[in-house]
């Protein structure tokens, strides 16, 4: 079994909390429990798909996992290789135009998001020779996506960073920055 956490490049740290890579060969069907982490994720299953009790179905090959409100069980069998992007709570909005509440307690297939870039990313990840090469591929795609970042997202990031830095920041200051 291999489980690794990798951190994003400096340009992506305000959007991506970390990447994780999981690989294991399950000789028998195995159930493992998933717990909410408070962040949305973009998940890729490069080998066998995983059955999730959260959606009572097999997870798609590539999907957005919204905020989950409770634990769920995952059934693994055979060779599994999962690569995921865990977004920062505020960073996810830079990549998806869909309102975030629409992802709540759901696993939305990449094809349903309506963004060609993520469909291309899915194909690149599934076709990559090595799981560690996938992180570099992901970084390139995400950097391409933030080139067209909406100004209001950049402003909200500044506001969140200021609140995290100094919780006594005045409402007036925050309002002035946001306008």
Please place each PLM-identified region on the residue numbering.
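Alpha-helical bundle regulatory/interaction domains
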Residues: 1-172, 176-178
């Amino acid at each position: 079994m291999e489980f690794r956490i990798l951190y994003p490049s400096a340009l992506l740290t305000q959007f991506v909390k970390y990447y994780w890579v999981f690989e294991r060969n399950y000789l028998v069907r195995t159930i493992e429990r998933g717990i909410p982490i408070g962040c949305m994720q973009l998940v890729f299953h490069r080998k066998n798909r995983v059955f999730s009790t959260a959606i009572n179905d097999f997870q798609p090959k590539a999907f957005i996992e919204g905020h989950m409100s409770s634990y769920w069980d995952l059934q693994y069998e055979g060779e599994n290789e999962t690569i995921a992007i865990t977004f920062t709570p505020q960073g996810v909005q830079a990549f998806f135009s869909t309102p975030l509440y629409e992802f709540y307690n759901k696993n939305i297939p990449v094809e349903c998001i309506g963004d060609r870039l993520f469909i291309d990313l899915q194909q690149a990840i599934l076709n990559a020779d090595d799981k560690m090469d996938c992180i570099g591929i992901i970084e390139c795609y995400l950097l391409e996506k933030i080139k067209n970042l909406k100004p209001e997202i950049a402003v909200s990031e500044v506001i969140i960073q200021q609140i995290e830095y100094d919780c006594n920041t005045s409402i007036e200051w925050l309002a002035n920055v946001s306008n």
